[in-house]
Amino acid sequence: MKAYNQTIEKKFYEQYSVTEYCSSTLAGDKKEVTVLGYEIEIPPERNPVRITYYESGWGKEYREKKSELQDKKEFYIENTRGRSSHQYHPFCIIECEDGVIMLLAIAWSGNWYLKITEDGRILTGQTKEMFARVLKAGEVFYSPSVIKAQTEDGNLDSLINHMHGFGRDIWLKHNSESRCLWTEWNHWWTFEDSQINEEVFLSNARAAAELGIELCTLDAGWFGNNRDITWSKLQGDWSHYNRERFHHGIRYLSDAVHKDGMKFGIWMEPEAMGALSELRKEHPEWEALRDGKSYENPYVCLGNKEAEEWLFQAMSSLAEETACDHMKLDFNLDPELGCNREDHGHQKNDGLQAHYEGYYRVLKRLSEKFPHLVIENCSSGGLRTDYGIMKRAHTAFISDVDVSSHSLNCFWHLSMFLPPENILHWAWSQTLEYEDGSHVFESFLIDDKTEESRIKYTIRAAMLHQLGMSRDLTKLSKSCKSLIKEELDFYKIHIRPLLGKGEFYHILRTDGIFAFLIKDREKGYLFLYNTSNIAHQPKLVLKGYNNGHKYRIENIDTGSVQELTGNQLMEQGFLADTIAGETAAIYIVHLVDAL
């Protein structure tokens, strides 16, 4: 037998036009073998001519880039921060000759590279610097998967809906509760950790109940024994509830929220190890080190089996003691190449691989123990969103920054790869004003002076996925509460039932204008957003309609009505009402009859 055998395995999901690829390396039966990285080749049906990919950073997710491939130069990008989406997102669109289009999604939360060679070969994996592992005789290593969706007719929207169907039916995680898409209030941007306490949380929870909000989430600031130490320094002390801020404990908050008919959510950063935490003092042997040195932001290496078991028990205890329905899991640091300690149980050059393998196991066990718990994936916003972690978490938080123009741009791109019901983001937040008068990002304050159209714009910008908000609900006037409740009710009654069931189309993105369509056979909702300061009157060409039917298009705000055939909607389109800056319009598209 050879020293080792390396093969590319693939599984074809014909109904969705999707193929899953992975690499397997089997050591021979005589001696051990060292795997120095791995590489998966994705064979294109035609020669690649263009790639669309996305740069990323905090508050700068989904910065679209395009590269022409006809000049026969090699294309190469890599992610080395240790989080799948920090430098680049692990998603891309590859256009080939003769109308062939591919969507690629890397199912891994750590480092990766993507290469398109001069002769058109598509290669992805990890370099030997990113990953190396010694296999014992007879041992096998399976690489993380890569997902490819492909169409040969050039119809990107059809391909996106196939990708959504594959994610929805085969790959992505869901349970009955995650499909409810609860509307959420989270205290973070308005109060952060410095201003949150028991009374602030409960008073806002009561206001949330009046608005019909269904989930109240307690973010950072609830753990550790000291009010004056920044939350990030105490992470890992998950069993120490901050009694200075929350006199009655966290279960008291949960019970109060449940009594008001809502769900309770709680935030944690499972992998983090606060620099001043009791965890770090008591278990220095679990800390990830690189070349014997601590990380600037320490973390627990889950390549250590004892640490992995501790984390599962800590998360289980938190879920049990707080009776939470939703757990927001964050990760705010870059492990880069990962831990290379040799006393953890993992090998010197596979620490990050072992860490994520351990984290995936923890999430799997947590869901098995708490099958109704909804798990939210967050990492400084959207810096670790990939098909690997989304096989183990129910929803992905788009970005820490939720200014509506940024949210819509991020959603435009992410919703090409993830179904809308697996995405969560907040309407533009009211951010905390710091002592120097600054804000983490521009705040959107709602009061009686705020234009009604701008309030609707910010809420509607969060309607095409799970909708949340972060603001002081107790300070809203009666008229503002009424408007917000009306918008939330519209979302819950009309839009949410289509998420996960309807077809989804990207209609228009130009000059600050975004338009999306979600529809079933009988009715569709067309969302038109103007994020600029200039009024526009765009022509909207729709998709997914029947040529032989007549449709009525009605603006829910102005009442304006047009009637057009399916052929007219998809060939000529219709002229929308003029839309002012920072405004959102919703059109209902009704089926009238067959011609």
What are these regions (language model features)?
Residues 564-595:
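C-terminal beta-strand-rich structural cap/linker in extracellular carbohydrate-active enzymes
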Residues 133-152, 582-590:
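Short Pro-Gly-centered flexible turn/kink motifs
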Residues 459-505:
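Catalytic cores of secreted or luminal carbohydrate-active enzymes
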Residues 1-120, 129-132, 551-563:
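Polysaccharide-binding surfaces and accessory modules of carbohydrate-active proteins
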Residues 274-309, 313, 356-474:
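Glycan-recognition surfaces
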Residues 176, 180-316, 326, 336:
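Aromatic-lined carbohydrate-binding/catalytic grooves of carbohydrate-active enzymes
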Residues 84-86, 92-94, 508-547, 588:
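Carbohydrate-binding surface patches
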Residues 138, 257, 330, 375, ...:
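Conserved, mostly hydrophobic/aromatic
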